[in-house]
Each structure stands twice: as C-alpha cells, then as structure tokens.
A protein has these predicted regions:
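Phosphate/nucleotide-binding beta-alpha loop and adjacent structural elements of enzyme active sites
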Residues: 1-264
Length: 264
C-alpha cells in the first residue's frame, strides 16, 4: 500500500537539503575520540582529519549514504573530492546534498562495461551497504533482491579522461570487489602512489582475507590498521586478524575492517 508520508520522508532532501543533512549526519557533528565509538562511527574518519592536507585529492569509491563525503566536505576543497556511487537512488540524493563535490554514477572494476548492481532488501529496508556487482544468492533473511544496470569502468580509464594532477588518497568500500578495482588501477597506483584505505570483510570473501591483503601488499604497499586507543597507525599482521572475534564485527571499537595501505 502506498504510504505518502514515507514517500515524503524519502524525498525530503529535495525540499530542504540543509535540514535533511543535519538529521542524516547528526552523529558526525562534533565528532571526537571520546564519542566516536558510542556513536558507532568508523574511527578512521577522525584519522583522516589529522593526516589529509586541505589540498589533498580524495577518491571515495563506494560513497554509500555519504558519511565520508559529509565529513571531508569540511576539511578538503570540495572540488578535490571525487565520489563514486553506482546506486542510482543514492547518487541522485548525494548530488543534491553536496552540489560542489564531484559525483560519478559509476562502479570501478577491472573492465569497462555494463554491469549489474544488486543489493538485498529486508521488509522495506534497503541494505545499500551490501550492494555488490557479484550475484547475490537469495537467503531466508532477505525479502527480495533488487538489481539495476550500471556502468563499470577501470580507474585507469577514468583517470585518463580527467585532468587530475595529484591523487593522495583512495577510500574503497565495495563489498568484495576490491581486487577487481585494483586490477584496473595499476597505472594510477604506479603514477600517483596514493594511500589506500580498503574495507575488507571476511563475509564477502571465500578465501581468507589475508590472501586479499597480501595481493595488495604486492602492489608495493605496507598494511596498517588504526589503533583504537592511540588513534595512530600500527603494522597489520595475520595474527591480529586471526584474534578478531566475528561476534564483534559491527563494533568498530573492537573489530578492524578498514585496512590502510601506505606506498613503499
């Protein structure tokens, strides 16, 4: 049954973007080391504030609802932020909320082609954070699977089509497609030598995720994680990941998902 109030709430960002942003990103306002975990926010956001110069060029691959875009909009020049979000609904919303930031309705992969983006739905909740170019097998917990056609492009091809003189940082959150992206980004990595922050979660990989991390290390990187008390980088080892208990996978104070790769 059509619910006009639900429809109005979903499209409120068109009526008043400023008010909508203040509500959507409320937990990011006045974010500190003292409240970041109780607000269930990725602590790497605070770290980025400390290490990125204002002129840094930042790629947000898998922008989602825009947490990183919102936070970095106050730190970097907005014209130096490039955000990729292939989900049509999220892309449309982000373009309206952040008119000065560069958004691309593209998926980054190892091929330039038309692809299918899928994400599960439970009842009426769309699980955008699980959107993937991989085929999703229907599970009992999912009400249905939503799919849409999207354009995939190699990062090398995209970079070659732009006039970008520097590239400092690439944040990657693309649900198991990390290596596909990097396989299409060899020229970019070798030329710009950007720092990478890659969200790698075991539930989206058949192989042990250290195998994924090792392949990225072979591109000339060292792997690190953000220490939860020191808020500085520490070397990442297989033992650290092995000691993690998946029961805490949604607790950013106890579980490491964002792996930070520094170019050698």
């Amino acid at each position: 049954m059509f619910n006009p109030y639900y429809s109005l709430a979903q499209n409120f960002y068109f009526i008043s973007p400023t008010i909508y942003k203040s509500r959507l990103y409320k937990k990011l306002i006045q974010l500190t080391k003292d409240n970041v975990f109780e607000r269930n926010v990725e602590p790497e956001l605070l770290w980025l504030k400390d290490i990125l110069p204002q002129k840094a060029v930042f790629l947000d691959v898998g922008a989602g609802i825009g947490n990183y875009v919102y936070y970095l909009d106050y730190i970097l020049f907005p014209e130096n932020i490039y955000a990729f979000e292939p989900n049509k609904k999220l892309y449309k919303k982000l373009k309206k909320l952040f008119p000065k930031i560069n958004f691309e309705p593209l998926a980054l992969s190892d091929k330039t082609e038309t692809s299918t983006l899928s994400f599960p739905i439970i009842d009426t909740e769309e699980l955008f954070e699980k959107a993937t170019l991989k085929e999703i097998s229907p599970e009992n917990e999912y009400t249905k699977i939503y799919s849409q056609k999207t354009q995939s492009i190699r990062l090398d091809d995209w970079i070659n089509s732009k006039e970008i003189s520097r590239l400092d940082f690439i944040k990657i959150d693309i649900v198991g497609q990390e290596l596909n992206l990097l396989n299409g980004a060899n020229e970019t990595i070798n030329h710009y030598k950007p720092t990478l922050m890659v969200k790698i979660e075991q539930e989206f990989h058949q192989e042990n995720i250290w195998e994924v991390i090792s392949k990225i290390i072979k591109l000339g990187y060292t792997a690190h994680y953000l220490h939860r008390e020191k808020f500085g980088l520490e070397p990442l080892t297989p033992e650290i990941l092995t000691q993690q208990n998946t029961i805490f996978a949604k607790d950013d104070s106890r579980y490491i998902k964002n792996i930070i790769f520094i170019k050698n």
